[in-house]
């Protein structure tokens, strides 16, 4: 199994590349890649071609540019030719406990995504290599909504236990306001 940081988003609501925003004095991309490396030694970055050359992880260019997270996940599967743990670059509080929980509960025959408090996180999951051709078909038919793909492919939703302190793990940073709130609450 390989691990991939999804960093190809437009970051339009943030107004700057989220992957490069500093979090605890490190770019978010590097922060997430380092966490992934604690659970899997084969870590890659999926995103815009050449955008992250300064980082010490191999890069995966999008096979189908501008196709959102689905395009990044497909590109990762095609590059790695293996089951792939994916994590977005904008979830700074994700940790090895959450990732180990996902790994311990995953079914190798289908897509596995984490669910927390009845919210599904399609970019935080394990995608088996055997779904690559199906993902390609969705992309070629311009069906890019991950929720539709997950439903069509009967993805397993792995419910992470809800406790008062675990909500933060699933926080996404999408806007400058999100960043300010998390900076002050961290």
Predicted regions and their residues:
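Dinucleotide-binding Rossmann-like beta1-alpha1 core, especially the glycine-rich loop
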Residues: 171
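A broadly conserved detector of short glycine/acidic/proline-rich loop/turn motifs that flank catalytic sites
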Residues: 177
């Amino acid at each position: 199994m390989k691990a991939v940081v999804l960093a190809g988003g437009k970051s339009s609501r943030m107004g700057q590349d989220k992957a490069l925003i500093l979090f605890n004095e490190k770019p978010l991309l590097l922060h997430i890649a380092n966490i992934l490396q604690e659970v899997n030694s084969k870590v890659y970055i999926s995103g815009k071609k050449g955008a992250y050359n300064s980082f010490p992880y191999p890069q995966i260019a999008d096979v189908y540019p501008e196709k959102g997270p689905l395009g990044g996940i497909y590109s990762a599967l095609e590059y790695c030719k293996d089951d792939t743990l994916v994590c977005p670059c904008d979830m700074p509080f994700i940790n090895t406990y959450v990732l180990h929980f996902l790994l311990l509960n995953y079914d190798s025959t289908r897509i596995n995504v984490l669910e927390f408090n009845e919210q599904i996180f399609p970019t935080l999951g394990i995608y088996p290599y055997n779904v690559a051709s199906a993902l390609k078909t969705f992309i070629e038919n311009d069906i890019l909504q991950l929720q539709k793909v997950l439903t069509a492919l009967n993805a397993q939703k792995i419910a992470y236990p809800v406790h008062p302190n675990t909500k933060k793990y699933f926080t996404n940073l999408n806007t400058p306001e999100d960043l300010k709130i998390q900076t002050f609450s961290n």
